């Protein structure tokens, strides 16, 4: 795996072997950014289930100012930290080593781009978006990108957000919510 485009484009990303994380493939990651960008002029990213950190690092590579990455698995945390170091711009990234629910209670400010790829997709995505809405963590132009199995049906609306785009890539479905 590698960063697809932007200032870190072509740099390799480390991933975990096994079933601890399900890294988004380069092809799907590229497609996600073609849906939502493909490039940005600043903004904050929240990656609530970071895995390897590839989505947030790609977002910063393409112009986002900074990213907060949340990961609970210790082995995955080490991979995320290595991938952040690879950028040589570690000050743009903050790794929170905790459960997503705890992170949602602690993060401050608003986010412009949020990635949700939880292990138990539908229920967790709905709960996470509702919690973020309660805490007012969405910028006025927020995009929430949800990656699930293609069989998962997410609600048309959750809290203050509605589906903007939805596409299937192989076994994955990408759903983008906006205000």
Each language-model region and where it sits:
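Class I S-adenosyl-L-methionine-dependent methyltransferase catalytic core
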Residues: 1-179
């Amino acid at each position: 795996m590698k960063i697809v485009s932007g200032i870190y484009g072509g740099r390799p990303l480390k991933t975990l072997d096994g079933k601890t994380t399900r890294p988004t493939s380069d092809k799907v990651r590229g497609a996600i950014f073609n849906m939502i960008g493909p490039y940005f002029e600043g903004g904050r990213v929240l990656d609530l289930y970071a895995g390897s950190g590839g989505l947030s690092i790609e977002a910063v590579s393409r112009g986002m100012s900074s990213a907060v990455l949340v990961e609970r698995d210790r082995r995955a945390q080490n991979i995320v930290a290595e991938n952040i170091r690879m950028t040589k711009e570690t000050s743009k990234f903050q790794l929170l080593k905790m459960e997503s629910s705890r992170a949602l209670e602690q993060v401050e400010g608003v986010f412009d781009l949020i990635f949700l790829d939880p292990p138990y997709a539908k229920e967790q995505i709905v709960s996470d978006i509702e919690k973020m809405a309660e805490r007012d963590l969405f910028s006025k132009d927020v995009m929430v990108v949800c990656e699930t199995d293609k069989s998962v049906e997410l609600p048309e609306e959750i809290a203050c957000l509605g589906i903007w785009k939805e596409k299937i890539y192989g076994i994955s479905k990408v759903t983008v919510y906006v205000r």
